[in-house]
Amino acid sequence: MAPSRKFFVGGNWKMNGRKQNLGELIGTLNAAKVPADTEVVCAPPTAYIDFARQKLDPKIAVAAQNCYKVTNGAFTGEISPGMIKDCGATWVVLGHSERRHVFGESDELIGQKVAHALAEGLGVIACIGEKLDEREAGITEKVVFEQTKVIADNVKDWSKVVLAYEPVWAIGTGKTATPQQAQEVHEKLRGWLKSNVSEAVAQSTRIIYGGSVTGATCKELASQPDVDGFLVGGASLKPEFVDIINAKQ
C-alpha cells in the first residue's frame, strides 16, 4: 500500500443487532485502540444510524448501508443522502452484492446513487465483485471492469470514493480469496483506474477487500501492496473486529 493511502476498515453490520447487543459492541469499539493511520467506519442498519452515531466515539465514522438516487419524494421505504447526513453519518455503502443480487439493483441504478450521494457530500464505499460462475468462466476481469466503469462514469471527485472488491463467492461463505487472488484483482483494478481515469486517481484511491475477512485472515491480506483495507461483514459484529482494525500494526 502506498503511504499516501490511509488504511480503511469498514464494518457492515447488515440486518443484524438490537440496541442492547449493538451497544455492547460499540462499547468494545470505543475502548479499542484505533491506529492513527487507519480510518474506521461502521455501517449499522438504517434504524440505528442515529443510535450508533450518538454512542460511537468520534474516531469511528458511521455509514448507511444504502441510499436512493434523489433528495426527497414518493419513494416508500427509501432513504436519501440528505437524511443520512442529518443523522450524523458521513459515508454510504453502495452496490453491495446483496443489493445487486437479492434486491435486483442494476449497475445503472448504482451509478445514479453514487453520483447523487457524492453530490450531497457523502463519502461512498462502492462495491464490485464477481460471482463464482463468473470466476470459473474466467471473466472476473470483464465483470469487475464493467461494474467499475459505471461507477467511474458517475464520479467527479475520487477523494470521497473507496472501491470495495468483494468476490461474491466469498461473502458469508467462509471462503476467502487467497491474499494472492485478492492482490491480483486489486492490482488489475488499479491498472484500470490508471488507464481509464488517471495515474493520480489510481495511486490515491483506496481499494479494499471484502469477503469472509476474519481476525485470522486479515494480516496476510493487509500485507498485499494493493489491498488498502477491508469491508467486513460478520466479523464486524464480534470483538475480533478490533484485530482487523489493527491488521496493519
UniProtKB/Swiss-Prot annotation:
SUPFAM superfamilies in alphabetical order: Triosephosphate isomerase (TIM) (SSF51351)
Record PTM N6-succinyllysine, positions in chain: K149, K156, K194
N6-acetyllysine carried by residues: K14, K156, K194, K238
Keyword terms of this UniProt record: Acetylation, Cytoplasm, Gluconeogenesis, Glycolysis, Isomerase, Isopeptide bond, Lyase, Methylation, Nitration, Phosphoprotein, Ubl conjugation
Pathway assigned to this chain's UniProt record: Carbohydrate degradation; glycolysis; D-glyceraldehyde 3-phosphate from glycerone phosphate: step 1/1; Carbohydrate biosynthesis; gluconeogenesis
Domain of life according to the entry: Eukaryota
EC code(s) of this entry: 5.3.1.1, 4.2.3.3
Catalyzed chemical reaction(s): dihydroxyacetone phosphate = methylglyoxal + phosphate; D-glyceraldehyde 3-phosphate = dihydroxyacetone phosphate
PTM annotation (3'-nitrotyrosine): residues: Y68, Y209
Gene Ontology annotations of biological process type: gluconeogenesis; glyceraldehyde-3-phosphate biosynthetic process; glycerol catabolic process; glycolytic process; methylglyoxal biosynthetic process
Covalent cross-link Glycyl lysine isopeptide (Lys-Gly) (interchain with G-Cter in SUMO1) as placed by the record, residue numbers: K142
Positions bearing Phosphoserine: S80, S106, S159, S198, S212, S223
A Pfam family this chain is assigned to: TIM
Residue list for modification Phosphothreonine: T173, T214
GO MF terms, alphabetically ordered: methylglyoxal synthase activity; protein homodimerization activity; triose-phosphate isomerase activity
Compartment(s) where it occurs, according to its Swiss-Prot or TrEMBL record: Cytoplasm
Subunit structure: Homodimer.
UniProt protein name: Triosephosphate isomerase
Organism for this UniProt entry: Macaca mulatta
Gene (UniProt): TPI1
